[in-house]
């Protein structure tokens, strides 16, 4: 491991955009949130690629790279590469005493990890905590993907079984298109998002409110017209 990034090695060889609007709910206190629940909330919208498709995408990815952090495709179809994870922790995590490591608590701190396509979200979280000798359970943290479209920012929590390097490959190397964020898993949903994300949620809610209001007006306008027609039939002279 160099001072610039961490590396995640795997022994085994066999091993994409929605706005999250369910940010009002909190996780039940004292009960861990299962991976299956996460999968149900955040459905994976991608299907895995064939070896030829992966080869083509890796080639295009490397052509677009500007920071020399390229991907490498192995003969067995597994590829390795780099992801950058931004630390957005509300409080400093517990670390080993006299660890000599920098604290990961600095808001906005960026870390680069060298991983393979087989590494899951859960393994990436463990690698980040191990890098800083954090003694807290990985279950207390969650990895989010943050996507940017025009002037809007979307974020959703990834399930522990998803593969970050695959998401990076599909999205391309630009972090202004897709980025990864580590946050506390148990924090309230309101506090877990940045100001631009919350502002985007407000825009979505305002739009939904306006649509519901227009639907309600159309419904009662149609009801009024039918009622007036019925009254005219009743009072029509014989």
UniProtKB/Swiss-Prot annotation:
UniProt-annotated stretches for the region Disordered: 26-48
Record has Cytoplasm as a keyword: yes
Domain SARAH: 187-234
Residue stretches making up the Ras-associating domain: 79-186
Family matches, as SMART domains: RA
Subcellular locations according to the entry: Cytoplasm; Cytoplasm, Cytoskeleton
PROSITE patterns in alphabetical order: RA, SARAH
Domain of life per record: Eukaryota
Keywords: Acetylation, Cytoplasm, Cytoskeleton, Microtubule
Tissue: Widely expressed.
Any Pfam family hit: Nore1-SARAH
Record-listed N-acetylserine modification sites: 2
Gene3D superfamilies hit by this protein: 1.20.5.110, Phosphatidylinositol 3-kinase Catalytic Subunit, Chain A, domain 1
One GO term describing the cellular component: cytosol
GO BP: any one term: signal transduction
Basic and acidic residues composition-biased segments: 38-48
GO MF term (any one): identical protein binding
PANTHER family with a match to the protein in the record: RAS ASSOCIATION DOMAIN-CONTAINING PROTEIN 3, RASSF
Name of the protein in its database record: Ras association domain-containing protein 3
Organism field: Homo sapiens (Human)
Lineage of the species this protein comes from: Eukaryota, Metazoa, Chordata, Craniata, Vertebrata
Gene giving rise to this polypeptide: RASSF3
